[in-house]
């Protein structure tokens, strides 16, 4: 996609590597350090760019396949390293630019054409060396020859690596497909279809958004899609995918993704999308956008076509990281400049006057003005279609032409700093809008490139969205690709109308896009359009170059930095086979096509020739293109025309062809002559782009005029449908688009080319679904077979310009078209080429703009390159731009001059067509595989859903189980906590001893208390009985008192009577005396006994009532005294006051019984003798003794209530009144005690005691100390003297209690023993013995 560096350039590229890549931290500048031979070959190829295009194309194809992988890897490492390539610019701003490039490698590449971005990593040193050599030497064909030889050498290596890459791609495809599918929606939404188309020129429509001049937008999209590693892989994949059928889709997607990554300014590169899904949707979106045919796309194509110089174009896309780094540097200045550019672009977008002022914009070189417009458009489209364009300034939001200009200015600024300084006049012209883009790029190079990429990628995204609308991402990818190809063809058709005036620019775009789509072959094709574009745009660029020079004077230092950056990017692009081949090869292809316009192998070259003739025949379109003031308006109009053509052509393959014819009306017509004309025009565009690239290297100013020319071409297309419809203008535009596409590819990035090619093939696939499969298959082969691709390009310059870009992306979509039908191929090629043309043109413009004379950029970093490359290439670019603008036929002549190489290219195109057919077949199989995979995925999703449900149920069940277990554990925890708390409360040994002692004390106290309670209860009962007895005695005494009172009264009466009668008185006195004596004795006895009893009990039980007892006790003496006194005739003495009932009873008995005599003893004892012989002795203390008549029975009643009876049988019964106990003593010595509680004790003479308790328990105490207790239930307990206890139960069991153990013997003979330590031993009658410990654990069990 980049112009191939000559061998000398490759050598200088190696020097450049050594000078520039001093450290791996320099991000992505030299991507393929691992392949020094490749770098040398690339350098040599750059040296031989002019001499042998096919060789160089082949070399770049080979080197690209190798270096793309390597380069992407280096880019990633370098980007990660983050070290800016300070050597590139002495200006401190350059390092920030490079760091930004590291951050946004894609953005910097997108400043360069997409192809260049794709290959910049590998080709940047080569491109820079190529620029140096081209600046110093202009033998492009020699360089091409050398490069071809080198490429042939490298092809072997590439082929070897293709297998590995294909395997990697197939593995990564599935991963990336998944990733891309998830990310399609996001990148697709970046920009509206309108803006995406605006960003993409009609040629750019086929190109992925990254192919647009706006690297920022491309980077944004790319970053959205994948990381750098993936994009790097995608680039490598693009090479390998071209060789494999499946890889073709992956490659398309990867390229598109790279473009998308570039749009996002991310280090991540779309190659991670090798799966192709992401790329295809984007191509679909781009296709939709191309169908819309927005003017902005045309304008952007014009802008990108502005980059005519090889230096500018390769520098732009040379190294993504590097450009991004440069963008980082430029971001600050670009932001300021973008503001100005936005205002200028708004003004320019409002009217053709503004568009006309574009050529006057500063920083413009040959083809740089158009590249700016393309960049500005892409940037503007991004601003409109995606919020990613926010980094773009309001100028981006302005009309597509303004935005494209600004965007291209950024590219130009990045590509051509020195050139800007050298050509301030042209820069002024273009700087009206593009300079704002430039300033914004310098200020925010990273953001600007990112915006460019975003603007470019959003269109691609839009195309994807449109394609998604048309069909599924992957399943409809092929159809979408065909539709994209058709749209791209439509776009070229639109481009060619304005290409009449700016044929070189349109071809530059087409070439740039073409390299993106075709890869190396696309690069070759795009290079020829670049030359053609250079010629066309030189006239317009002359005007813009002066203004650029004026502007370059003011910002020369910044432009130098940018130029260095772009040179470095070109060098990297040269190293990148696809990128470098795209631009450089396209220029050579333009030469070849000019030389061999009629030598095309397929009908497409004839159509290209006819288109070229139509372009020549249509001076209006060319004049419009040449008109730089109208360029902005024309570019916008072309964008609109392109959108119209795209929408018109998207309806059917024919419509697509018509759209492509609008870019290239010749291409739209299916006649072989027209096709040849179109191819010739494309060849011219390639040659122009080639020469313009060289002139760009020589003169940075030439870039922007060609961009302006492209804008004018857009305006011409817009102004007159004839331009869009004119086959000649369309063909020229296709060539210009090829140039632009080449330039854009080189400047933008490999990813740009990938996206663009993906779009192209999506259009082509939609237009020619059956053709796409074979072409994709062939493309996979051609992808790495650079020779074959270059040959095809030579055969069909225009077709190659288109197809090679697609092949770079798709493998061989172009070949597919060729194999199916020339018309179809032409249409698809045109579409592809249109998209590529837009990028190629953008790239050419970018080259014209961005790569200042190698003397400027390379002089800073490589003084050796300073003298020749810059002046020669610049002058050649100016002349070529002027020729391309003023004389499209001359470009065609140049292509005819290159007809020889074109013949070779035609042959390669034929090969590519066959490979495209193969790719189409492979795409069909891939579509089936995708359908199967989708069904499998659907099934998997269902299974996943079922599994999720089951998992949810299981989780619920597990959760429920967990909760239940948790509750159980909580309960157990509570129990355990209680247990532990209790365990904590367990006392220690000392405390246990104390507790035991206390318990013992408590037990003792309880026993004492029980004994006391028992005693208290007995005492209480006695006291109650005494109280009752006292109450009764008291009652008796009262009654006795009453009786005695009666006796006293009677005594008074008798006394009175006795006074009357002395005898009676004497008798009565004697009687009274006896009675008184008796009564006194009785009273004394009763009173004393009762009183003594009371006193005794009172003293014993109621000591507090001692006074009462004493009073009672003291009372009897008075009574007795009174009675004694009463004996002396004191009848009034109250003898009756202590009358007891027993006395009364005995008195009654005495009265009843006749008292025989009464004897009073000196001691106070009174003995009464009754007639029945019974004697009663009354003692003074109240004791009474009764003796029976026979003397055997004696009853003694003691004063305390005790009663002793001696029975006739000699039994002695003593009754203890206090204890209510009866003690019976038998003559044989047996003593029986009956207690009040019912207990009975028997004391036997042998000392044995038998106690019968109230419950009928009998306890026997033997004299030897043994005890035997018989309980009511029949249990017998025997206590031995040694303390052992034997218990015999009524059920036959027997227990033995000893101090050491307790044994129980069962009736069946079983013996169970419990020892003091708690062990239990059980012996069974069977002989079994079981021993347990205190806890119940079985220690031994003889039974098995």
Curated annotation (Swiss-Prot):
Residues 211-225, 388-398 have a biased composition (Polar residues). Phosphorylation at Ser-577 and Ser-583 by PLK2 is required for procentriole formation and centriole elongation. Phosphorylation by PLK2 oscillates during the cell cycle: it increases at G1/S transition and decreases during the exit from mitosis. Phosphorylation at Ser-583 is also mediated by PLK4 but is not a critical step in PLK4 function in procentriole assembly. Keywords: Cytoplasm, Cytoskeleton, Microtubule, Phosphoprotein. GO terms for molecular function: gamma-tubulin binding; identical protein binding; protein domain specific binding; protein kinase binding; transcription coactivator activity. It is found in: Cytoplasm, Cytoskeleton, Microtubule organizing center, Centrosome; Cytoplasm, Cytoskeleton, Microtubule organizing center, Centrosome, Centriole. Residues 67-123, 187-225, 257-300, 347-407, 425-470, 600-626, 672-735, 1105-1133 are annotated as: Disordered. GO terms for biological process: astral microtubule nucleation; centriole assembly; centriole elongation; centriole replication; centrosome duplication; motile cilium assembly; non-motile cilium assembly; positive regulation of centriole elongation. Its main location: cytoplasm. The keyword Cytoplasm applies. Residues 259-271, 282-297, 709-720 have a biased composition (Basic and acidic residues). Residues 887-1344 are annotated as: Interaction with STIL. The modification Phosphoserine is found at residues 248, 304, 528, 577, 583, 748. Residues 307-382 are annotated as: Alpha/beta-tubulin binding. The keyword 4Fe-4S does not apply. One of its GO terms (cellular component) is ciliary basal body. Forms homodimers. Associates with microtubules plus ends; binds to beta-tubulin subunits exposed on microtubule outer surface at its distal tip; also associates with microtubule lattice. Associated with the gamma-tubulin complex. Interacts with the head domain of EPB41. Interacts with LYST. Interacts with CEP152 (via C-terminus). Interacts with STIL. Forms a complex with STIL and SASS6. Belongs to the TCP10 family. Plays an important role in cell division and centrosome function by participating in centriole duplication. Inhibits microtubule nucleation from the centrosome. Involved in the regulation of slow processive growth of centriolar microtubules. Acts as microtubule plus-end tracking protein that stabilizes centriolar microtubules and inhibits microtubule polymerization and extension from the distal ends of centrioles. Required for centriole elongation and for STIL-mediated centriole amplification. This is Centrosomal P4.1-associated protein. The gene is Cpap.
